Amino acid sequence: MAQVAVSTLPVEEESSSETRMVVTFLVSALESMCKELAKSKAEVACIAVYETDVFVVGTERGCAFVNARTDFQKDFAKYCVAEGLCEVKPPCPVNGMQVHSGETEILRKAVEDYFCFCYGKALGTTVMVPVPYEKMLRDQSAVVVQGLPEGVAFQHPENYDLATLKWILENKAGISFIINRPFLGPESQLGGPGMVTDAERSIVSPSESCGPINVKTEPMEDSGISLKAEAVSVKKESEDPNYYQYNMQGSHPSSTSNEVIEMELPMEDSTPLVPSEEPNEDPEAEVKIEGNTNSSSVTNSAAGVEDLNIVQVTVPDNEKERLSSIEKIKQLREQVNDLFSRKFGEAIGVDFPVKVPYRKITFNPGCVVIDGMPPGVVFKAPGYLEISSMRRILEAAEFIKFTVIRPLPGLELSNVGKRKIDQEGRVFQEKWERAYFFVEVQNIPTCLICKQSMSVSKEYNLRRHYQTNHSKHYDQYTERMRDEKLHELKKGLRKYLLGSSDTECPEQKQVFANPSPTQKSPVQPVEDLAGNLWEKLREKIRSFVAYSIAIDEITDINNTTQLAIFIRGVDENFDVSEELLDTVPMTGTKSGNEIFLRVEKSLKKFCINWSRLVSVASTGTPAMVDANNGLVTKLKSRVATFCKGAELKSICCIIHPESLCAQKLKMDHVMDVVVKSVNWICSRGLNHSEFTTLLYELDSQYGSLLYYTEIKWLSRGLVLKRFFESLEEIDSFMSSRGKPLPQLSSIDWIRDLAFLVDMTMHLNALNISLQGHSQIVTQMYDLIRAFLAKLCLWETHLTRNNLAHFPTLKLVSRNESDGLNYIPKIAELKTEFQKRLSDFKLYESELTLFSSPFSTKIDSVHEELQMEVIDLQCNTVLKTKYDKVGIPEFYKYLWGSYPKYKHHCAKILSMFGSTYICEQLFSIMKLSKTKYCSQLKDSQWDSVLHIAT
């Protein structure tokens, strides 16, 4: 919206870059105000001149009007710069008052204006009200002025010396007026004669003339003061206002105007102002000025902005609502923020709102998944959302859900939002048992109906839970029937917690028959809870007709390598289960033989049938896939001994290959500069804070940059994108700190950066798709094949210099041959992907038979399955069901006449496509196994992790 025109006026030899930056920031802030005014259908046009630059800021129509008047811009620039601000003599005012151009007079005027503003604020309005100095000096207890320096009494600014005036302006944020006893004269009335209003400071274009303007004022809602003025006729006497600017160390520029406005104010002391309901037949322009009820917007603004008198003139078609648009937007943002806080609290397992870490969620995609957002609305902090987006979010509130996939870096979710409940002194009351069917078990309120626990003994929480979930069915129980139902539910809870009632001791029966806050039941050890889960897992494993395992390793806080083993199995009903099988500490050697012995021991612990093992997914390290002594080789040998002819499939993780492929681009000359500058900014707190402020003032899209790490390679694309979109800001910031980056001025380097941005964003999109929940191996393979096809397409497009799929590169491309330079890099990337996916090529026919049974060619099917596949392809009933439900649900409807094909599908369905599930476990381990609880035994940690997964 802002436009800058370079003037031909002479430039000062020593210009302050810091002052220019301040001017640029303020113009940017003014531009943001114009955007908000445009949403209210108000038109604004502003011209600012600084040295040789002319800034045009305003709404679309306002800028169009000013841009059409280039002569007006030139005249205004010459007037402001050619003569010099200090040499301009103001025209003689009508009332004969002389306005001095000296420094003291300007400061006195600024102090007087601020006193008027503070006095008006004390009266409950945001407009400036003349201060009754004589009355205040006569009756000093009526109005108290706070914040003045010691030894300085309140008086008219014309009696202050230069040093006192400067001190007042530098510390004006702490000055305030307190009215203990209002004055009853007409001067004190809001809208009385001599009142300084926004209308006095409005400027009419010098090229246009207008007649008197009738101004109707409306009383503020909260002021409690009735306005006496019925109409104000404003006449403009001066065509060319004089603008004075004074820069003082430690303060921002303040402006005053010496234009004189004659006001005719007919007063009626007996009749308050009442808005007329009749249409106005006066051809003169009618303007309504409404007071702003939000005083915080004035007190919290910057010092330089407080001195600016911004007039908003609107012509409403109908009566405005009581709440201003700013208050409505604020309410919307608060409602959306409360919604997000409640949803985030539910995601981390608490029943109260928790402050949402918006920055961490935005800069760490994939850690927290937000489902149910309206189409086209991206999750952001409410302060960055449009009004329409916030309304759509509130309409879809019941569908929005937060899911924590993996912990956010630097955020302990186990401690987020925890309240100091012990300090609240809440006690469970016995009457809540009968009212809401709750009892206290181990000092925790527990619902007798659904066994759900509340974190706090608070009646509101218990009543809300009961009315929301159970009142419909349990309100029918009254008096004696309700007591009997309560006794019955207590027995059910006792059986639920302790199992059979025959084994209970009398003490335990007494605990649950008469629960009280002072009685405590024994705590069930975590090993016992995990033992029950392990027993259920053993039963589930025995029902598997096919299963696969995924193996990965990581080093914990104790510098111990932890080997995680996951199992994925399919039963006869084609129900898929993914469970943690075991975690094994690797304290000795980490050879393939040692890993095999640990895995074999874990499988024996669960009595797993080796003949049903289909595949093993690993990270592809030498200890895993070595042809002689690797883990996969030994597992294949063991499976062959149990089931002759069986072949164990080996799958290398297909999530990590694009990280390795990204290294094949060989663009370290770009990444080194980006990493160096980003880490320099982010690793120093002061630099990071200042850079965030810089981006905020320049109204950039991103508030900060992502900190780049080699381990967290997923951040590569996000870092590059934010770096490219903030090139100008980074260049300016680094240069101002004595760390210039000459590469940012190189066209070739910027072109390489743009290509790397596009390429890494494509790779990140692929990675996020591969990390979906419950992914079938065929779906993941389809995603990789699709990406390979895209690489071929991009290679063809680049030969024609078609940059349709490289939008960032297209922005900086200037020559038709720019795309040709990157064809070899695409070719290398394609070759590397094909090499990494060679394992899947071996099983492509089997995967195709699983995903597309009705379109597979019989010649590509294994001989033992051909007859059943032919029968299947000719079965129209199953074909209809396949088209309706798709895979994998379709295989639940297969009849018993396809036993071999069903077994084949069960094996494919059981395969892991990656070790991503292991990485999720390691995230939980890092979150839980901190330095404060790292001394637990391995068996205890095994139990904890098993319960957590």
Swiss-Prot record:
PANTHER family: GENERAL TRANSCRIPTION FACTOR II-I REPEAT DOMAIN-CONTAINING PROTEIN 2, GENERAL TRANSCRIPTION FACTOR II-I REPEAT DOMAIN-CONTAINING PROTEIN 2A-RELATED. Ubiquitous. Gene3D superfamilies: GTF2I-like. InterPro entries: GTF2I, GTF2I-like_rpt_sf, GTF2IRD2, RNaseH-like_sf. This is General transcription factor II-I repeat domain-containing protein 2B. Its main location: nucleus. It is linked to GTF2IRD2B is located in the Williams-Beuren syndrome (WBS) critical region. WBS results from a hemizygous deletion of several genes on chromosome 7q11.23, thought to arise as a consequence of unequal crossing over between highly homologous low-copy repeat sequences flanking the deleted region. Belongs to the TFII-I family. It is found in: Nucleus. Pfam families: GTF2I (PF02946). Keywords: DNA-binding, Nucleus, Repeat, Transcription, Transcription regulation, Williams-Beuren syndrome. The keyword Transcription regulation applies. It comes from Homo sapiens (Human). GO terms for molecular function: DNA binding; DNA-binding transcription factor activity, RNA polymerase II-specific. GTF2I-like repeats lie at residues 98-192, 323-417. The keyword Transcription regulation applies. One of its GO terms (cellular component) is nucleus.
